[in-house]
UniProtKB/Swiss-Prot annotation:
GO biological process, one term: mitochondrion organization
Keyword GTP-binding appears in the UniProt entry: no
Membrane topology, record value: Single-pass membrane protein
UniProt-listed PANTHER family: NADH-CYTOCHROME B5 REDUCTASE, NADH-CYTOCHROME B5 REDUCTASE-LIKE
Full protein name: Uncharacterized FAD-binding protein C17H9.12c
Length: 266
């Protein structure tokens, strides 16, 4: 080793040590960052805004505490699971939008529902843990030239998400509680010009509500019909899902004489 190289050695070692320390600090710093939304482990989100719609239903706007790239390329209809860590219970929820910077949920509180009660106990600034996203169905909704959706209550959420991602006409039969307006109807129609909403209130939905629409050019045999709501509602409209697996079950109920090309129960 030459004398000049020997004299430079402390500087070289110091530079290497500095680089190593910087790399170690970066790794340590990033190891302490909370995870972004992912399907494997729960990630923390901050409750950014709560908008009360009724005494038992609100919009919850959640923002990730770390970047969540998984939502940028996902196709509808997608869902996440939310858990109450104190009880180790979880439940799937469908966000209204697929936005990497914010997830907005339409959630109704049920006294017998531990997760919905947990979410409604939160205040702006609190943390809620999410995991996902997951595909709700393998059905390719984008290939149908027209979609008819029959929904009740918070069952509007998957259709809200879907309507923003397809160019096809989406005609929605929206059944709401007696004396209660169809929540988010005006927002959905404003945001999605391809959407028409027919509100059914204070009575039972009938087959004419589903089939009778003006200015329809797509044959029913080419139309996708989606039914979304409580188990009882889905069963009344299209028959129950199969008791095992993720099978759809036979189409019965109000749609027993099924005129649609495809009926899908969510």
């Amino acid at each position: 080793m030459s004398s000049s190289t020997y004299r430079k050695l402390p500087k070289i070692l110091a530079a290497g040590l500095a680089i190593g320390c910087a790399g170690g600090y970066y790794a340590y710093k990033n190891s302490n960052k909370p995870p972004g939304l992912n399907p494997e482990i729960y990630a923390p989100f901050t409750v950014n805004k709560i908008t009360e719609l009724t005494s038992d239903a609100s919009l919850f706007s959640l923002v990730p505490q770390s970047p969540s790239e998984h939502l940028t390329t996902l196709e509808p209809i997608a869902k996440v699971t939310i858990r109450d860590p104190s009880m180790q219970v979880q439940r799937p929820y469908t966000p209204l939008y697929l936005d990497a910077n914010e997830l907005k949920f339409f959630i109704r509180k049920y006294e017998e529902g531990p997760v919905s009660s947990y979410i409604h106990s939160k205040k702006e600034g609190d943390t809620i843990e999410l995991r996902g996203p997951f595909k709700t169905t393998k059905l390719d909704c984008t290939k149908y030239p027209r979609i008819v959706a029959i929904v009740a209550g918070t069952g509007i959420a998957p259709i809200y998400q879907l309507a923003q991602s397809v160019k096809s006409p989406v005609d929605i039969v929206y059944c709401s509680r007696p004396g209660q307006p169809p929540l988010l109807k005006e927002e959905l129609e404003k945001e999605c010009p391809n959407v028409r909403v027919k509100s059914v209130q204070n009575r039972l939905v009938n087959i004419h509500d589903i089939l009778d629409w003006d200015n329809v050019t797509v044959p029913l045999k080419d139309t996708l019909c989606i039914v979304c709501g409580s188990q009882k509602f889905v069963s009344t409209i299209a028959g129950p899902k199969a008791d095992y697996g993720a099978r759809q079950g036979e189409v019965k109920g109000l749609l027993s004489n099924n005129p649609f090309g495809k009926v899908w129960k969510l």
